[in-house]
Each structure stands twice: as structure tokens, then as C-alpha cells.
UniProtKB/Swiss-Prot annotation:
PANTHER family: UBIQUITIN-ACTIVATING ENZYME E1 (PTHR10953), UBIQUITIN-LIKE MODIFIER-ACTIVATING ENZYME ATG7 (PTHR10953:SF3). It comes from Rattus norvegicus. Belongs to the ATG7 family. This is Ubiquitin-like modifier-activating enzyme ATG7. GO terms for molecular function: Atg12 activating enzyme activity; Atg8 activating enzyme activity; protein homodimerization activity.
């Protein structure tokens, strides 16, 4: 038992100081890396011995806590810890805190017994952090523990704490500062958690713990040590001293009767360094009977009410609302990767730049679904204004947008996207798209305007990754199809009937530097099995576009049409279905390693192993709402296509707007003559006449 006449040493426990950056980094780690993994993780904190008077003893964790190689802040001492992050609040509450403390304490005890703590004294200052992160509410529950081994009896004070300036002269204090700094530089560290020191009238010497036998050679009464002390109390040392005294009692109680402890505190105020507020005292070193069993340990932090329990931090109120929205938008997407689709590459989807040609019913629904997938860059092109019939079918508009003649759709749609989610980069262009069969040569003004529209469209397609064709008329899709095919851009097309729709990806032409016989991009196409469909295993560069099934060139489809024929009359739910499928098709294409060159999946592939983590990658999806049915046809590129055939693309790339102006200002026969459709019609008619002649002779 200790001497009842001596006062007992008491210690100031650590207070956890978890920075907002730590919680942000934990959120990112949980979403992107840990997911459902509850295995312990190594983290790193630090404590500082230069705080002003009145501040508590703090162990700080910042955003860099998860990077074990991150540098420790200047003049701070690192502390290694273990993070136990649970998946549910119930698991957090029912975690065996006693077992966690015992396991960590046993690691410290083993380091003491083996001598590893002498080689690496940081092993004495381990900590635990038990957490649960509610990422929907941004509530973070945690319980901090800094394990401290308990000696069999209290530690009696032989000489009570006094200021360093009462024990050492100014010359000795200056020598101590220089000796400590030199040792830190020699070891390449910002601070030493523990060090040996001895002093006489003229000199002060310091050394590492592992050199104690040489440093105190011949001395058998008193051990003098320095402890990097984060405490500011004048009569009590900080928590790091506790485990060191257990180490000293275990290893040196047979050689030394007492320990003189310097609680080294190093403060800079008004540019002047001061260590005189450090305290120095002497304690009796208790004898510690040899035992292989780990001593009892304490260390769980009390909560804000002073009781034994966890703490909770609510960061939802102090976070930037825009950043909070951005994190929340990504939450559901990242949760897909935890269990359902662990191979999903979200970066490919989020970073894609999408150009929506058409801001009507299809355009609005496509835009909302793109935002649901986390796409951050959306551009609208449309020349119409919002009418009173639009808001009920087009969810980006409201009644006020129709007043005063109506706002331009493209600009209003972009503005509404930014109101829905400020993190989206949305823009709108109020412009017309020149079309075949719609002349632009009425005057120099109209011709020049058409030229500017074409140049603007070329720039937009060139600066985006995926082009959505969502317009009302067939001919309005021709020019973007040609430009996108020439620039090798992925095109997703959606078109509506009354109760039918088609969603398709255009075939992606080979890179221009490849020869006609090269496969694209690098993988051979698997041969079709005998007896399989004629359209099996068709690679992306052989797939047709929206116009490849036509045997006539596009023209003015609005001429001589009644009102019900001019407007897109379709069942109200059709655009929502088609718009969603268009975006999902894009995402599936992006997830395929070949991208737009992916082999097309057909209806025959529905029972086969899907090519991507999200399933099939079809060429077309044709839906029939009257039967609630979809089919996945595949069609080959047509060598006489009026939009994507080599003849059309060559003319466009060679002549540019000159060629396009001929298409706009001429009848459909111009494109048909160019591509060979006219000759095909003539040959077909000749064959029919020949068949009739044969029948007449019979």
C-alpha cells in the first residue's frame, strides 16, 4: 500500500477534439471505400503542449486522420488510434466497449513487456474511436477512449509539482530547449512523446528512452524523464504520463526508487517561446509484481453531461446548403455500390456532359432522370416558348412561365435545373436547328442565320459527350445526327407515337484514322453461333441510326398537317417511360468497357449473362404501351442512309455548310440522289415491272 502521509498523483484526461473535416472525410470513406465493412481502421491524431492556459487537454483528429503517412502539424505529437465504424446505430449502442478497451489495453501491455514501447514510445498513447455516421441526417455518434493501464496502487508524490523556473536556472532552461530541439531534428520528428534528461549546474542532456541503461549508467536512485504534456494545469500532469509510469514501474522499479518527471510544456506567445510554465515533480516508483496478465484499464470519455456515454454531433445546420445538397444527391447513387452493384463506375456517369436537343416533354423528363444519376453538366437547345399546355406534361415548367407570351424553353429549363440542384452546370440555348426541306435561302439574312445556327450546333456537339435527340419532328434530327456521326459522339434518340416509342443509340463510327477493315476499338467480335439470330453480336460501329431504316430522305413533315398531326399526341405516361429508358440506356453504354462500340443486346439475350453490371446494352428499345411490352431489335447501318452513310459524311466533312445549305434548300431528291436511294427506287420499280411481265407471259 502507498504511504498514507503522501498526496496522490492525479491526471487530466484527454478531451476528444474531432474537426468537421474529420467527419467529412469519414463520410467519403464510408460511402466510397468502407461501405459495409466494419473492420477496424487505423487512424492518426495529435496533441499539442503549447495551448494557452484554461484550454482542456485535447487529442485532435482532422481530415488527415485517415492518411497514416500525412505529416503531423509542427511541434505536435502524433497519436495512433483505431476506428471502429458501425453500420447501424443499434450496432453502435450494443458494441462491447469493455472488450474493445481490453483489447487495446492488452496491445499497450504487450508493447511494455516486449520492450517495443522503449523503441517506439508512441505505442503508449493509443486511442479508440467508436462511431456511427447517419449520412442522411448528418448526425455523427461517437465515443472516444484513450486506454490507460492502472497500477496496483495510487502513485504517491514525494515532491509536489512546481514551475520549471523554480527548479532550473534560466541558463539550464535554455540548454533544455536547445537539447530537446536538437534531439527532435536528429530523429526527424516534430515532437518526442517521452525523453530522458539529466542536468547539473552547467549542462542539460536529453536522450531517447531506449538508451536509458547508458544514459543513467551508475545512477541507482532516481530516474529523470520528460513527458510531452498537453495539460495546462499547474498541479496535475496530462494523460500521456499514466502509461509511461506503468512502463517505468514494470521495467525499472527494481533499479530506481523514484522518478522525477518534467511535464514539458512549450508555448509561444507574442513571438516569444516560453517553457517556464512546465511543471516538475517527483513520485515514488511503485513496485509492480511480475504478472503476464494485463492490468485493469480505464479511458472511455465522458459525454457532455458528465456521464459515461457517447456523444453526438449534428452537422446539418452548419454545412453549406449547396454542399449538403450535393452530398445528398450522391448518397443514393453511392449506396448502390455498397451491395447491389459494387462494380458500378459512377465517375463515368457523373462526369459525362449531356446535350439535350429539345426541351419539351421528352427533354424535361430526360433532364430530371440525368440529375437523378448525378450528371452535373446538362445543356438544352430549343427555339420554342412555354405555352399554357406545357406545364402539366413538362415537369420543368410552371404556370408563371407561360405568362407574357412564355419564357424560352431552353433558358427556363436550365434555370429550373439550377433551382432544383444548385450544383448542376445547366445552360440553355434559344436557337433553331436547320432542317432538310425547310429552305433558308429566302434572303442573305436567313442564310447567314442558318450558318450561325449550324456553327453553334457544331460547337455544342463538339463540347459534349452524349447527344440526346428529343425533338418533335423527324427532319429536325437529321443535322445533329450528321454532325455527331462525323465527330464520333454517342447519340441517344427517343421518339414517341400515340402509344408506342423508340429509344435507340446510334451506331458509333470508327475513329477516322482506322481503316475500313479495322475492328473497333480493339476487341474482335465473337462469331455468331450456328442457328442464332442474323443480328447477333453486331458491334457498335455497325449499328444503324434513326434514319437507316428509311428509303426516303427526310423532308418537311409539318406541311399540310392538321392540328392533331402537328402536335405530339401521345399517352401522357409515354414520355416519362421513354425519357427514363433513354437515360438508362446511356448509363448502360457508359458502364460497358467498349462504350458506344459495345455489341448490341437483343431480345434473344434476355436469358443470357448480361454484358455489364447493369444488364443488357441494346441497340433499340421499342415499346408498345397498349400491350405493356418492349422488344429489343437490332438493325445494321444502311450504306445508303441519308444521315450516317459515308457518302453523306464525306460531303459534309469536305464542303461543310455549302453541302448543308443544298440539303436545306433542295427537295428530298437531293439526298436520295447522293446516297443512291433514287437508283434503288428505280431498280425496285424495274424489278416489279419485270415480275409483272413474267406473269403476263404465263
Amino acid at each position: 500500500m502507498g504511504d498514507p502521509g503522501l498526496s496522490k498523483l492525479q491526471f487530466a484526461p484527454f478531451n476528444s477534439a474531432l474537426d468537421v473535416g474529420f467527419w467529412h472525410e469519414l463520410t467519403q470513406k464510408k460511402l466510397n471505400e468502407y461501405r459495409l465493412d466494419e473492420a477496424p481502421k487505423d487512424i492518426k491524431g495529435y496533441y499539442y503542449n503549447g495551448d494557452s492556459a484554461g484550454l482542456p487537454t485535447r487529442l485532435t483528429l482532422e481530415f488527415s486522420a485517415f492518411d497514416m503517412s500525412a505529416p503531423t502539424p509542427a511541434r505536435c505529437c502524433p497519436a495512433m488510434g483505431t476506428l471502429h465504424n458501425t453500420n447501424t446505430l443499434e450496432a453502435f449502442k450494443t458494441a462491447d466497449k469493455k472488450l474493445l478497451l481490453e483489447q487495446s489495453a492488452n496491445e499497450i501491455w504487450e508493447a511494455i513487456k516486449s520492450g517495443a514501447a522503449l523503441e517506439n514510445p508512441m505505442l503508449l498513447n493509443k486511442f479508440l474511436l467508436l462511431t456511427f455516421a447517419d449520412l442522411k441526417k448528418y448526425h455523427f455518434y461517437y465515443w472516444f477512449c484513450c486506454p490507460a493501464l492502472c497500477l496496483p496502487e495510487s502513485i504517491p508524490l514525494i515532491r509536489g509539482p512546481v514551475g520549471l523556473d523554480q527548479r532550473l536556472s534560466p541558463k539550464q532552461i535554455q540548454a533544455l530547449e536547445h537539447a530537446y530541439d536538437d534531439l527532435c531534428r536528429t530523429e526527424g520528428v516534430t515532437a518526442l512523446p517521452y525523453f530522458l534528461f539529466k542536468y547539473d549546474d552547467d549542462t542539460v542532456l536529453v536522450s531517447l528512452l531506449k538508451h536509458y541503461s547508458d544514459f543513467f549508467q551508475g545512477q541507482r536512485t532516481k530516474l529523470t524523464v520528460g513527458v510531452y504534456d498537453p495539460c495546462n494545469l499547474t498541479q496535475h500532469p496530462g494523460w500521456p504520463l499514466r502509461n509511461f509510469l506503468v512502463l517505468a514501474a514494470h521495467r525499472w522499479s527494481g533499479s530506481f526508487q523514484s522518478v522525477e518527471v518534467l511535464c514539458f510544456r512549450d508555448r509561444t506567445m507574442q513571438g516569444a517561446r516560453d517553457v517556464t510554465h512546465s511543471i516538475i515533480f517527483e513520485v515514488k516508483l511503485p513496485e509492480m509484481a511480475f504478472s503476464p496478465d494485463c492490468p485493469k484499464a480505464v479511458g472511455w470519455e465522458k459525454n457532455q453531461k458528465g456521464g459515461m456515454g457517447p456523444r453526438m454531433v449534428n452537422l446539418s445546420g452548419c454545412m453549406d446548403p449547396k454542399r449538403l445538397a450535393e452530398s445528398s444527391v450522391d448518397l443514393n447513387l453511392k449506396l448502390m455500390c455498397w451491395r447491389l452493384v459494387p462494380t458500378l463506375d459512377l465517375d463515368k456517369v457523373v462526369s459525362v456532359k449531356c446535350l439535350l436537343l429539345g426541351a419539351g416533354t421528352l427533354g424535361c423528363n430526360v433532364a430530371r432522370t440525368l440529375m437523378g444519376w448525378g450528371v452535373r453538366h446538362v445543356t438544352f437547345v430549343d427555339n420554342a416558348k412555354i405555352s399554357y399546355s406545357n406545364p402539366v406534361r413538362q415537369p420543368l415548367y410552371e404556370f408563371e412561365d407561360c405568362l407574357g407570351g412564355g419564357k424560352p424553353k431552353a433558358l427556363a429549363a436550365a434555370e429550373r435545373l439550377q433551382k432544383i440542384f444548385p450544383g448542376v452546370n445547366a445552360s440553355g440555348f434559344n436557337m433553331s436547328i436547320p432542317m432538310p426541306g425547310h429552305p433558308v435561302n429566302f434572303s442573305d439574312v436567313t442564310m447567314e442565320q442558318a450558318r450561325r445556327d449550324v456553327e453553334q450546333l457544331e460547337e455544342l456537339i463538339d463540347s459534349h459527350d452524349v447527344i440526346f435527340l428529343l425533338m418533335d419532328t423527324r427532319e429536325s434530327r437529321w443535322l445533329p445526327t450528321v454532325i455527331a456521326a462525323s465527330k464520333r459522339k454517342l447519340v441517344i434518340n427517343a421518339a414517341l407515337g400515340f402509344d408506342t416509342f423508340v429509344v435507340m443509340r446510334h451506331g458509333l463510327k470508327k475513329p477516322k484514322q482506322q481503316g475500313a477493315g479495322d475492328l473497333c476499338p480493339s476487341h474482335l467480335v465473337a462469331p455468331a453461333d450456328l442457328g442464332s439470330s442474323l443480328f447477333a453480336n453486331i458491334p457498335g460501329y455497325k449499328l444503324g441510326c434513326y434514319f437507316c431504316n428509311d428509303v426516303v430522305a427526310p423532308g418537311d413533315s409539318t406541311r399540310d398537317r392538321t392540328l392533331d398531326q402537328q402536335c405530339t399526341v401521345s399517352r401522357p405516361g409515354l414520355a416519362v417511360i421513354a425519357g427514363a429508358l433513354a437515360v438508362e440506356l446511356m448509363v448502360s453504354v457508359l458502364q460497358h468497357p467498349e462504350g458506344g462500340y459495345a455489341i448490341a443486346s437483343s431480345s434473344d439475350d434476355r436469358m443470357n449473362e448480361p454484358p455489364t453490371s447493369l444488364g443488357l446494352v441494346p441497340h433499340q428499345i421499342r415499346g408498345f404501351l397498349s400491350r405493356f411490352d418492349n422488344v429489343l431489335p437490332v438493325s445494321l447501318a444502311f450504306d445508303k442512309c441519308t444521315a450516317c452513310s459515308s457518302k453523306v459524311l464525306d460531303q459534309y466533312e469536305q464542303e461543310g455548310f455549302t453541302f448543308l445549305a443544298k440539303v436545306f434548300n433542295s427537295s428530298h431528291s437531293f439526298l436520295e440522289d447522293l446516297t443512291g436511294l433514287t437508283l434503288l427506287h428505280q431498280e425496285t420499280q424495274a424489278a416489279e415491272i419485270w415480275d409483272m411481265s413474267d406473269e403476263e407471259t404465263v
